[in-house]
Structures are given as C-alpha cells and as structure tokens.
Amino acid sequence: MDLSADHILVVFLLTTLAGLATGIGGFIAFFMKRTDTKALTFALGLSGGVMVYISLVELLGEAQHRLMEFEGHTAGSWIAIASFFGGIAVAALIDYLVPEDENPHEARGPEDIHGQASGEFSSSRIKRSGILFALAIGIHNFPEGIATFAAGLDSLTLGTSIALAVAVHNIPEGIAVAVPLYYGTGSRKKALFYSFLSGLAEPVGAAIAMFFLFHFLTPTVLAVLFASVAGIMVFISFDELLPMAERWGHHHISIMGIIAGMLLMAIVLI
C-alpha cells in the first residue's frame, strides 16, 4: 500500500472526480430532447453493465481471493459472501428508509420525469423532490467514496477502475437530480449546483477514510469493504438503473447498453 503524500492526493482527486460526475449528468440534462429517450435508455443500461461487471468480476473476486489468503479457504469464502449480501442489505435498508415518491432508486419513466414539467405537480413539490433526490443519492454514494479511496491506496489500477464505474453510474443520477430541480425552480444554476452537491458524498467518504479509518484499513478490512461495496453497487444496478432503463420503453437498446458497459469494463480491467 502506497502511503506517500503524492499518491494519497492522486487517489483523493480521483475519488472526487468520480463523485462530481453527477454534475456532468446535470449538465447533459439541459440538452436532452424530451422525446428522445433512446440515449438515456442506453446510458442507464451502460451504467448498470459497468457496475454489475466490476462488482462481480473485480471487487467480489478480489475480496474473496484476499479473504481466502488471510482467513483460510472456508472462512474467507463465508466472510466474502456475508460481506457481499451485507452490502446488499445496507443498500436495501437505505432504500426502504427513503420515501418512495422521493427515492431516486425507484424506477422512473419519461412520464414521471418529464411529465413534471406539464403542470401535474406544483413547482415547490418538484423542487423538493429534486433536493431529496440529491440527498438520497449522496447517502448511497458515501460508502462508494470510502471504497474508491481505500482501493486506490492499495492499487491505483483497481481504484481507477472503481472510480470509472462510479463516474459512469453517477451521470444518470445527476440527470435525475437536475431535471426536477430545473422544472421546479427554472434555474439552471440551482439544478447544476445540487447535482454537483449530491456527488460530494464521494470525497467526503474519502476524507473520512483518510482521517478516521486510515489505521483500521488492514488487508482483511479492505477485502470486506470491497465485497460490501460490490453488494451495494449490484443492488443499485438491479433496483434502479436496469428497471429505469426498461421503463423508458427500449428493451433492446437497454440490453445493448448493458453489454457495452460490461465490454467497456472488461477492456479497462485487462
């Protein structure tokens, strides 16, 4: 594990850039045609494919390999399994605690997002939904920031791969924040501000890992963290990204996006 100041700074910046990709999504939202749902369908599928592939192939595989090395074959396998499904349970609990109407991880179609501009809801309610989307996304992204930073300290290659997956996943989440806020306030600046703000949970998680969890990041703890975040990312993909892609009405385009996302990460991880 490289603990030099330069390496730590590089990893922290990498984590920050991954989180701020929500702002890219917020920016893209202003240029999307409401009737063109194919691009977002593909993007959602791509995000899901990226996250599922890196979670199951890289993070969980790496966690299981390390745990088996340090804890023994049987114990290591069980710890990896428990950590993975523990991550799923944590993500599901967070999802349960956020009200359905304001949860960005409840599948939404064009009638839910763009329909808000037609006057079905008051501007104050739309604005409130956008702010709550940003808050909920921040809560979900917090452990990803810890994992990206910890992985980057251990291996810059692994940290970069996780950061790329998180960044790709954050772009459609930024869209989910920016669209209702833009419709509710009429201000592009506010929509962009909150979409960027929701991504700050990533560097906050990295900062906490750096200042408070640093001395506890043993090889076993790192492996447990990798497996847990793999579970969180798989849950987000199956609960949010893939169902939302389906609801936009282009099944085969979403499948192509998933395959493209998996292929992208397979090439990146070579």
Curated annotation (Swiss-Prot):
Transmembrane segments: 8-28, 40-60, 78-98, 131-151, 162-182, 192-212, 216-236, 250-270
InterPro entries: ZIP, Zn_transptr_ZupT
Keyword terms, alphabetized: Cell membrane, Ion transport, Iron, Membrane, Metal-binding, Transmembrane, Transmembrane helix, Transport, Zinc, Zinc transport
Its membrane topology: Multi-pass membrane protein
Compartments reported by the entry: Cell membrane
Gene that produces this protein: zupT
A GO-annotated cellular component: plasma membrane
Function: Mediates zinc uptake. May also transport other divalent cations.
Descriptive protein name: Zinc transporter ZupT
Keyword Zinc: yes
Catalytic activity line of the entry: Zn(2+)(in) = Zn(2+)(out)
UniProt: Zn(2+) binding residues: E144, H169, E173
Binding residues annotated for Fe(2+), in chain numbering: N141, E144, N170, E173, E202
NCBIfam families reported for this sequence: PRK04201.1
Principal location listed in the UniProt entry: membrane
Family affiliation: Belongs to the ZIP transporter (TC 2.A.5) family. ZupT subfamily.
One Pfam family linked to the record: Zip
GO MF term list: metal ion binding; zinc ion transmembrane transporter activity
